[in-house]
């Protein structure tokens, strides 16, 4: 059990006399749980345990020894100043007595010495009260030293000797001036650290801090107990060890009770919620301690709510909603420990109580389990009253059919079949008339039929058959049929009918973790074992047809049985003389599932095979199967008392008996080497050596002998040691080669092939794990010398983020299998920084064939987020062609959404619509906006009608506004905006569109806008709407410096905000050309207004003291100017030539209205490349030649920056 590794944390070195008694309500279940799970001192002593002292004890002893050396005078005074010291003989005698008798003797000997004894406290060990020595701190050597000290007068050390200690240049720690442990300081320090860890959510550390306080008998306040308990529930340290989590939680809670601290309701909520959740998890994962967890929880629940004065009255407790819900669920899993009336009384008295759907589902379910007809009728009336009230809970109304399904089940199982039938008719008619969901019908009928099958399986089958012939009745789930079949086992013919029906169906079981708590009660749990039960019945009845169908189904549909059924299966296969091929197929299929279970099941599985089949050819096939190596790697001597290894031993013995080929040598040696490392492991070797298991002792000697014989034969045949796994050379160091001829040469043959053959892969994995810097340094050195390395080395380098192109290529080259390839590919992407992904991964020649097929969703997301060119990434991935499959689309749902979002942000609207024909866009808003912005208005209108009911009202308005704006129907856009109520306007977005429409309308009329903007985009739209520069400046000053409008003026207007506004104003000018180009070309006044707005933008940019343009801004500005003057690129080129002609080393290019473009840091090369592209697009060959000629002249005079 997991409890056995936590002896020290319970303080096993203390006596029972030091422990305080727990309260009565906590004794029964908790003490039972502790005594039966090894919580106290009931653990058996491990063999040779003296070789492995507990690390905490070692640390404590070492610390105290060092402290004694630093303060020897304190130790002397504490012993020598006593008036009646113990003699040497008495101390030796007392070493062997119990702590209780020692305390009794010391209370007699030191009754008059209470005021003279001085006792120091240690923060790393338990503190005992005055006059009580801990015998564990005295060794024989100490007793002799102390007896000598009592007879010798203490000599004061010279003052200069102490001064030498004080003059040490680098003290190990700050000098402790306290004569003993200052408990208040110690407590406050720990409180501060616990609070800090709690705030940082470092929950793993908090319990160790509390244990430090506990070891020193310091009791923290209730607030700290609350945080400790909460951290125990939340810490990830023991997420996979439920027993330990519950043990630590209950121990901490009992400590609080023992110290007579009254828990507040917050602590009750933490403890109860954790216990209820723990009991549910234990049930799911078949942990036998689940019932004990629930017993403790319900006992605590009852005790905290019972009023000792009036037993019929419930004490008020402020339980949380989660505690109430999980209590209701746990009640249904472990029924009979509390009455429904008591539970309802407590739940209804809590302020968090809500009469929601889960309350009714859980209560009906519990009343059904306890066969409480009266409670069911009361609940039914209460439910109908709640549903028909003037303002019923919306959740209750939405989930009413879930509740009705439990009501139907309750009526049938308590004998009210006729009432249930009438109610079902009414409900089905109601759903049909209201065009309700098919899932509601399926849920109602499933509950009705499953409950009916418990009462009368034949009648239930007749009803199902009638429903099955109705086209409007949906198909039932696979789980439904399994439960239906389980309830019909007494009628074997009916069972076979149901099994024949579900035999071709896909085995689709719901996951253990449900979406809602009510799903645990509405849908069957633990149905995966029903097939095992069916197989068990068929084996008992010797129904060959059903048996073989189940066995074949398990192979085809990939599922396993409970481990206890396999002996009977193999016995049956032996009786029918099953062929080896089919038998091996069955074994390999089921071994793949056994691989995922614990090691005990693996060896039990082997034992079952060997008990029924001893064929050498079969055992040879098993020992060479893929799963066998995994089984061998799980061999552990710690389990030798729990499981027999006869099956494994038989398979290994078979290695020697059968003929071997040279190809078999590496594998056989590897299997033997793994066993050698397990049998001679330092930690488990004493278990076998000191035990009485003669079979394993003989097996160990046999393995050692066979391994040395195989190694010698391998060497004599002069085979290539590079073919062997690294574990072989490791095992050679563990066996005794003294009695082997040329033992050292044999060892060198296996251990040093790299010295004479650099093609032998070296293993630096463990070196890198233990010392990353040293390991990476050694790897770099050996790589330069031409050595190669194994897969583990490269994997560890990737884990430590030491990644380059060579390591990636080599790692992929030596990757052992496809499963590991998928893991390593995703590990690489998770460890490589985002800025390097394009260079190392996306541009890798193997990206398309190796990386893409193995990418998980999170890895794909990281690549898309960090790729430098999305179009290049899409091309390499072959999107969307390789994403046609629905399964691939479901697996990469988030990645596909991100691709479409980035395409949308990049303005690739036509690409989105084209890809949508192959891989549908799930974001409807994005799809509709892409239709609008690409000019596909008819497609937008058809899609808008098709998906009208799947888009929210506010989103519809925003999309329609954008549609009207893009159609240049500004009047319609303003009308729609004015008709839209404020509550339907999307914050920011709706006003963004409205202010942009005002900007477009400013080409036709003067715009006056009085509402304050909500963001920089609206601010930029308002500024762009101004026709004159004076109006623009006045609007800017009014808004930017107003505290009531926008808080831009924090320490001066931030440069980031200014840049956003200017970029958005420039984008507005560019969008106006796209949207209004036909009108502007035909209307001179509009063209003049555009020219004025461009000029206003340039002047405003200079006014804000940010005249510099980057390359993107320059491109956009040139595009706008080119619309007004097609010769703008040529004018820019002429300006550049003149600037360079005047000053060859010019740092910037001066443009109109004082704008500047920097020619430093690749700027000159970028502008030339842009001009060349621009002239190529316009087909201006003459200017293209001029740009190229100018570039060549510049190269001669000074090198252009690449």
From Swiss-Prot:
<dbReference type="GO" id="GO:0007005">
    <property type="term" value="P:mitochondrion organization"/>
</dbReference>
<protein>
    <recommendedName>
        <fullName>Ribonuclease P protein component, mitochondrial</fullName>
        <ecNumber>3.1.26.5</ecNumber>
    </recommendedName>
</protein>
<dbReference type="InterPro" id="IPR013888">
    <property type="entry name" value="RNase_P_Rpm2_mt"/>
</dbReference>
<dbReference type="GO" id="GO:0004526">
    <property type="term" value="F:ribonuclease P activity"/>
</dbReference>
<keyword id="KW-0540">Nuclease</keyword>
<dbReference type="GO" id="GO:0097745">
    <property type="term" value="P:mitochondrial tRNA 5'-end processing"/>
</dbReference>
<dbReference type="Pfam" id="PF08579">
    <property type="entry name" value="RPM2"/>
</dbReference>
<feature type="transit peptide" description="Mitochondrion">
    <location>
        <begin position="1"/>
        <end position="122"/>
    </location>
</feature>
<dbReference type="GO" id="GO:0001682">
    <property type="term" value="P:tRNA 5'-leader removal"/>
</dbReference>
<keyword id="KW-0496">Mitochondrion</keyword>
<dbReference type="GO" id="GO:0030678">
    <property type="term" value="C:mitochondrial ribonuclease P complex"/>
</dbReference>
<dbReference type="GO" id="GO:0005759">
    <property type="term" value="C:mitochondrial matrix"/>
</dbReference>
<comment type="subunit">
    <text>Consists of an RNA moiety (RPM1) and the protein component (RPM2). Both are necessary for full enzymatic activity.</text>
</comment>
<keyword id="KW-0809">Transit peptide</keyword>
<feature type="compositionally biased region" description="Polar residues">
    <location>
        <begin position="118"/>
        <end position="134"/>
    </location>
</feature>
<dbReference type="GO" id="GO:0045944">
    <property type="term" value="P:positive regulation of transcription by RNA polymerase II"/>
</dbReference>
<dbReference type="GO" id="GO:0005739">
    <property type="term" value="C:mitochondrion"/>
</dbReference>
<keyword id="KW-0255">Endonuclease</keyword>
<dbReference type="GO" id="GO:0006396">
    <property type="term" value="P:RNA processing"/>
</dbReference>
<keyword id="KW-0378">Hydrolase</keyword>
<dbReference type="InterPro" id="IPR051114">
    <property type="entry name" value="Mito_RNA_Proc_CCM1"/>
</dbReference>
<comment type="function">
    <text>Ribonuclease P generates mature tRNA molecules by cleaving their 5'-ends.</text>
</comment>
<dbReference type="GO" id="GO:0002181">
    <property type="term" value="P:cytoplasmic translation"/>
</dbReference>
<feature type="region of interest" description="Disordered">
    <location>
        <begin position="109"/>
        <end position="134"/>
    </location>
</feature>
<dbReference type="GO" id="GO:0005634">
    <property type="term" value="C:nucleus"/>
</dbReference>
<dbReference type="GO" id="GO:0003729">
    <property type="term" value="F:mRNA binding"/>
</dbReference>
<dbReference type="GO" id="GO:0006397">
    <property type="term" value="P:mRNA processing"/>
</dbReference>
<dbReference type="GO" id="GO:0030677">
    <property type="term" value="C:ribonuclease P complex"/>
</dbReference>
<keyword id="KW-0819">tRNA processing</keyword>
